Amino acid sequence: MSPSESLFQYTEKIYALSINLGLGVLGGYLQDKGYNVKMRDLNITLVNKYKDENSKKLFEIVFDINKFKNYIFTGNDIEIDSLIESFLSEYDIANEDIYGVSIGSDFSFLQIQFGFLLAKYIKIKFNKHVFIGGNNISFLYIFKDVFKEMWEIVLSEFKFIINGPGERCIDEIIQDLNNNTNSDKLSSINGIINYIDGEIISNPTMKPLIIKPDWGDMDLSYYTKCMISENDSEKAIKENLIYFYKWPDTFAGSVGQIINKYNKLRRSDVSNKLIIPYIFNYNCPYNCAFCTQSDIDRSSIIGGDPDEVIKDVIALKEKYNTNYFYFLNNAFNFSPKFVDSFCKKIIDINLEIHWSDCGRFNNLTYERLELMKKAGCVKLTFGFESGSLKIIELIDKRINLDHAERVLKWCYELGIWVDIEVIVGLPQEYDEDFNATCEFINKNKKYINYFWINEFFVVPNSLIGRYPEKYGIELIKDINNYRKLLDNNLKMFKRESDNVMTSNSKLFGFNEINRRNFDAIVSDNRKKISKLSNMQNSEFNEAAKFYTMLCEIK
């Protein structure tokens, strides 16, 4: 796993890295196939070796397009060799048969660039095949016109760049290499990206599988949360659920990150516990126009069998000695039948676990939510997006706002925390539409734990990206290019810019036909984000300030 600059940007993350589910899925699948798999997360090396500003400067070369291009083409650069060798010095990887590099999933250009450089180094140093994957590959491919120069560079050197789920693709590559299969057959494997007659073309991606993750021989101590020691104490369990489920912990200064630091530095009644990520359904039966899940190849749900999923959960609970899970499905309640069966079985066997997941308001009743609570549900995150009926209809959200309110109240009564996702800046969102969103939030503020504020950006393979005129907009595709993004990210890395990393995903702009232009939309969005931010529950900022102060006391 290539390292991300988020550890430099969000220093509290040093106190608990995020365990990568993709590595676990790969490990689980390939080990079941009989492969001896060794996995290494170079973010751990980043934590151990490169904490200060002087060492941070070593990474600035990664953003240099000329050095990047020269190294991929020639493999000759003493500075880059030195940086990579320093990263790999504590690992014995010289005698493996084949190598893989993940370039991550969070739009990090350090992670992307470093990952490709690392793959080139390994290829030259060990003279072995290297495959490259990670969700950032899908991001780069979706915006392949923006990143055409990068694709031309890396596809000139690497045969096995994988788009989409990689586990079966890797298995096929290895089998075909062992059988001395010709290059034409190798290049036709599903998921492989090729450069053909000046075009960047991905073969159809593999369908995802429900796989029990297994992180093999990785040192998982870096991913643990510093929890209050429980000893069957209901009070301690309640505290831990507040700290690590109720309180947000994914952004700079978030109270969840700070409390983890405080527990580690200041408390003695603590123990380290993993919260295991696990996914058991893919794709989405709905067709929200803004979402990448509205792509034509993602409408068919791939869902796990309740008995098999529970079997996986039990195995993960026992192997990693934890009752805590983050389920990472698009919608836990994609199927009422699955929900009822899964929850009843957990209750019947008295399986003690705590979990959170995403959900849809649709098909949820008080009784079903009560069942979920008894089965260990702690928090649900719902895609609310907008309180405007006009916007809901435009994006084909298919939610009933009255029912959504009832679900929020039921969750509150049952003790399930609810986060909601809000999107600002959707096409044709005017003052009256935004005000409807604010009114819904204010009306239901008592029942909403936290709301995630997302600024809309166009995804090319979504319905809005494919048919912009239907949504009253025209796309602007030239506001960014690869070189400009590298320059902007270097400035951010050096703290010369206050852009957040997720701005890397906002690569297309748009004008509304006969209404607002792009600049006006961006200006409106800033005001909306500011207003919504001021509506958040004050509990989180107050707790963050309090525990930050306690951490700083000598």
Model segments located where?
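A structural motif corresponding to the C-terminal lobe/cap of the Radical SAM core domain
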Residues: 8-11, 158, 303, 336, ...
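Short catalytic helix/loop segments, enriched in acidic residues and glycine
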Residues: 15-30
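Glycine-rich beta-alpha loop elements in corrinoid/cobalamin-binding modules
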Residues: 26-29, 36-46, 50, 71-211
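Hydrophobic/aromatic residues located in beta-strands of well-ordered beta-sheets
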Residues: 37, 130, 189-190, 325, ...
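Radical SAM [4Fe-4S] cluster-binding motif and immediate context
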Residues: 221-417, 439
